Regions:
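Conserved pre-catalytic core of RNA-dependent polymerases
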Residues: 1-100, 104, 108, 136-137
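Active-site palm subdomain of RNA-directed nucleic acid polymerases
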Residues: 1, 103-136
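RNase H-like, metal-dependent ribonuclease domains
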Residues: 178-193, 212, 217, 236-252, ...
Length: 667
């Protein structure tokens, strides 16, 4: 359907993808796209209950349930108190704010008109809540305007009959084209008002301009992210305020997501230098806030030390990760150009992953038991007299296998899975294989206990929702077998010398050494593994880019590789100590020649050894100053360092301790 709000597998990203795909497709073939971006006023507050009950009737909802919903909507009382005065009144319009049914009821009420608008005439409709985009594409713009007028009239008629409205002044009309000369046109009419064309429109948080250059949207993103960052900056000083770790979290969790919102549809713009420069300014400001570094510190050095991706790479990584679940849920239409080409030719991403549209389960016809470890001292828990089956999964040398064992049913089975599978998948599939064995053997017993040492597998099978196809398939088998048996999934503690579980573990290990059978080849890579591979790929790109930087001479020696663990240790330091370490690692420090360039006070010679021939430099401090040899031995592990590059193996905490002990920390 056209509605993308409050639906499994749909989101603002799917809505934006459909809108931008339609525009890109028409621009590629040198056609026009006319889009009316409008808002249905009073969607949740003013819709009449009759519109909702009419929609429910068309859907064949039970009459008694429909009457109950109608009563809930028409017999509500609102009470307001001020001082000693209290007023109450009945509310018989709209849906309750915060009501769990309200979004669903609105979707049902508006669904019919959205389908009617899409019917015939080449019209495409994309809606998210009450924000609607009506799209026409073709070669003749005036024809598109006339068709749009008819659709707007139909929508206006529907809204008025339901107690709603559309404000022409808030409706944005954009004619998307790459042509410079556009013929004179009569714009569409809405509610007796002739609309005017706009160069851009705001839709679902993005500013979409008529040529899809994304310049206006990037400016808007930068403005919002800057406001958020400077709001936090008030609590950050050079030697006081939030510590670097918290400021780093604020940037990564709040500011950067604002910058990269909707990047799945505008990532091609990241190839433009002007756009990456605008985005980079925000990240540089954040890096200075995190580190307390001097403003002269190169951006590349700050990004490397703080493990911050340049935003062109961060945006493409996020776009790839966002596109995969949309593709696997059939919400993504790939194309050889434009934003929908993000996954084309990508050898890292498989053609399909284990992701599926989230599925909900209203009933669980089997039992799950996670007993305390001590319970096992008394013997296997669960219903007595039941058939016991032990399952396990294993991963050895990047090979994945599973095992099933039951002494009562004489089952000793091993199986192999594709190497991209996870141990979690092996544990779940082992349970499913146990159910298959039950179906083949058809034992006379009615109670079945299936034991697994994976709490994650048992809890996922007991969850009310799942987005894993592996879990969904196993859950389906459990539901089917529950008609024949009383099934209990029971956790068994691993590595406790429980004999049957040890045998299942041995079978799982053996499964990693046997050939992969044809029926297991189609088991797909888990989404988490796919994300990890993408992240590792972009980490390599970041490191490769850092290795090719021609500037940052000192930083490339003191921090030759981008290592997250070292960055985390640095950010755990206090603000003042973190600032001192970064200034020393980059050479952008208020000492010697650098201080002279900035017009800051400095010493003509080394303050420690008092040698008039030795200038204060980072190399002299860390490598050769004889007056600091004992402190260097104490903190850095050697009285003298051969080269400044030896600093790359020393932890930031020890570097901070040495700087403080040397007395140079006022630079």
């Amino acid at each position: 359907g056209a509605q993308h709000a409050y639906r499994k597998g749909k989101s603002t990203e799917t809505a934006l993808h459909e809108v931008i795909s339609a525009v890109e497709k028409s621009l590629q073939v040198n056609e026009y796209s006319l889009i009316a971006f409008l808002d249905i006023e009073g969607a949740f507050n003013n819709v009449i209950p009759g519109a909702i009950t009419e929609a429910l009737t068309d859907l064949g909802v039970d009459r008694h349930l429909m009457m109950l919903i109608d009563q809930l909507l028409t017999c509500r009382t609102v009470t307001s108190s001020m001082g000693s005065s209290t007023q109450s009144r009945y509310v018989n319009r709209g849906t309750p704010q915060g009501g769990v049914l309200s979004p669903l009821l609105w979707n049902k009420a508006v669904n019919k008109i959205l389908c009617d608008l899409e019917g015939g005439g080449g019209c495409k409709v994309v809606a998210y809540e009450d924000d609607v985009a009506i799209i026409f594409s073709g070669k003749f713009p005036q024809t598109l305007c006339d068709l749009m007028t008819a659709k707007l009239a139909r929508l206006s008629e529907w809204t008025e009959s339901r107690g709603l409205g559309i404000n022409p002044s808030k409706t944005e009309l954009v004619l998307f084209t790459t042509k410079y000369k556009i013929p004179s046109l009569n714009p569409p009419i809405l509610n007796g008002c002739r609309l005017s064309f706009s160069d851009s429109a705001s839709y679902l948080g993005l500013v979409i301009d008529k040529k899809l250059s994304w310049n206006l949207s990037i400016k808007d993103r930068v403005k919002k992210a800057t406001i958020a960052l400077y709001t936090c900056k008030k609590a950050i000083g050079l030697k006081w305020g939030m510590n670097p770790r918290i400021v780093q979290w604020i940037y990564l969790a709040i500011v950067r997501p604002i910058l990269l919102y909707g990047v799945a549809v505008w990532w091609p713009a990241l190839s433009k230098g002007t756009i990456t420069k605008q985005l980079g300014k925000v990240q540089r400001t954040a890096a200075l806030c995190i580190s307390g570094a001097l403003s002269t510190t190169p951006t590349d050095a700050l990004n490397a030390i703080l493990c911050l991706q340049s935003l062109d790479l961060a945006g493409k990584e996020q776009a790839e990760i966002a596109a995969i679940p949309l593709r696997d849920s059939d919400q993504w239409v790939s194309h050889h150009t434009g934003h929908a080409s993000i996954l084309n030719g990508n050898k890292i991403v498989p053609t399909k992953t284990d992701y599926c549209v989230p599925r909900e389960y209203t009933d669980t016809p089997f039992e799950t038991i996670i007993p305390h470890r001590n319970i096992w001292l008394e013997g296997p828990p669960g219903p007595k007299g039941a058939i016991r089956i032990f399952t396990d999964g294993s991963k050895l040398d990047n090979k994945v296998g599973g095992g099933i064992y039951s002494e009562q049913l004489n089952i000793r089975q091993s199986f192999r899975l594709p190497d991209h599978c996870s141990v979690f998948q092996a544990e779940v599939i082992a349970i499913k294989e146990a159910l298959s064995c039950l179906q083949e053997i058809a034992p006379a017993a009615t109670h079945i206990n299936i034991y697994s040492d994976s709490q994650a597998a048992i809890k996922s099978l007991n969850a009310i929702t799942t987005s894993s196809a592996t879990v969904a398939n196993c859950r389906k088998s459990l539901h089917e077998m529950a008609y024949q048996f009383v099934i209990s999934l029971i956790w068994v503690p691993g590595h406790q010398d429980i004999e049957d579980n040890c045998i299942a573990d041995e079978l799982a290990r053996a499964g990693t050494t046997i050939p992969l059978l044809h029926d297991k080849e189609d088991i797909r890579m888990p989404m988490a593994t796919c994300k990890l591979k993408i992240k590792e790929h972009f980490k390599r790109l970041i490191n490769d880019r850092w290795q090719t930087v021609s500037l940052c001479r000192i930083t490339r020696q003191t921090w030759p590789n981008i290592i997250r663990k070292r960055t985390d240790e640095l950010c755990k330091l206090s603000r003042s100590r973190c600032s001192s370490v970064i200034r020393s690692l980059t050479g952008h420090w208020l000492i010697g020649t650098h201080a002279s360039r900035l017009g800051a006070p400095y010493n003509d010679f080394c303050r420690s050894c008092r040698d008039e021939d030795e200038e204060e430099t980072v190399e002299h401090l860390f490598c050769s100053c004889p007056a600091l040899s004992r402190r260097r031995l104490q903190y850095l592990g050697a009285p003298f360092l051969i080269n400044i590059s030896d600093m790359s193996t020393i932890s930031p905490r020890r570097i901070a301790g040495f700087i403080r002990a040397s007395g140079w920390d006022n630079g």
